[in-house]
C-alpha cells in the first residue's frame, strides 16, 4: 500500500512538472498584470529611441542597456532621441506612479512608459530577466536567441 502511494505521488509530481503554463513569464517581482501574446521581438541590433523630455539619468540607463545588449549579442544597437515606431521606444508617462512602468512587446517594437528613472530601471530589469542570462555577461555570447516574448 505504501509503495503504491509513493509511486502515485512520484507520477503526479512528474506529470505536474510537464504541464507548465506557457502563459507566464519568469520575472521577479512578477508584474501586476501580464498578457502573453504569440511571437517574439528580435532585440539584437534593434534601435533604442527615447523621448527628448527624458532626464539625463534615464537616458544613461537606456544607453547602458543598449550597450550591454550590443556587447553580448554581437550586434550593434543605435541610441537616439528620435520618434520611432520600431525598436525599443522609451516614453515619459507622468500619469504613472514613480516606480511604475508599462511594457508592451510586439513583433516590431518594445514600448516602455514610465514617469521616472526608477520606472525605467525596473522596466529594463524586467526585460533583462526575459532575455538569456548571458545579458549580464562581459563578452559576446555565441548561439543565443536575443528575443523577447510578445506581451503587454
List the model feature ranges, each with a label.
Residues 1-26:
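Bacterial Sec-dependent N-terminal signal peptides
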Residues 17-152:
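Acidic, contiguous N-terminal accessory segments
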Amino acid at each position: 500500500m505504501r509503495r503504491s502511494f509513493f509511486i502515485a505521488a512520484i507520477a503526479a509530481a512528474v506529470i505536474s512538472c510537464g504541464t507548465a503554463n506557457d502563459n507566464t513569464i519568469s520575472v521577479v517581482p512578477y508584474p501586476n498584470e501580464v498578457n502573453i501574446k504569440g511571437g517574439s521581438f528580435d532585440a539584437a541590433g534593434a534601435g533604442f529611441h527615447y523621448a527628448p523630455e527624458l532626464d539625463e539619468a534615464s537616458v544613461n540607463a537606456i544607453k547602458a542597456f543598449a550597450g550591454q545588449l550590443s556587447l553580448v549579442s554581437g550586434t550593434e544597437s543605435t541610441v537616439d532621441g528620435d520618434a520611432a515606431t520600431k525598436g525599443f521606444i522609451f516614453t515619459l508617462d507622468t500619469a504613472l506612479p514613480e516606480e511604475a512602468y508599462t511594457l508592451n512587446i510586439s513583433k516590431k517594437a518594445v514600448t516602455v512608459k514610465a514617469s521616472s528613472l526608477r520606472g525605467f530601471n525596473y522596466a529594463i530589469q524586467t526585460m533583462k530577466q526575459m532575455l538569456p542570462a548571458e545579458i549580464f555577461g562581459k563578452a559576446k555570447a555565441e548561439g543565443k536567441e536575443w528575443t523577447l516574448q510578445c506581451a503587454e
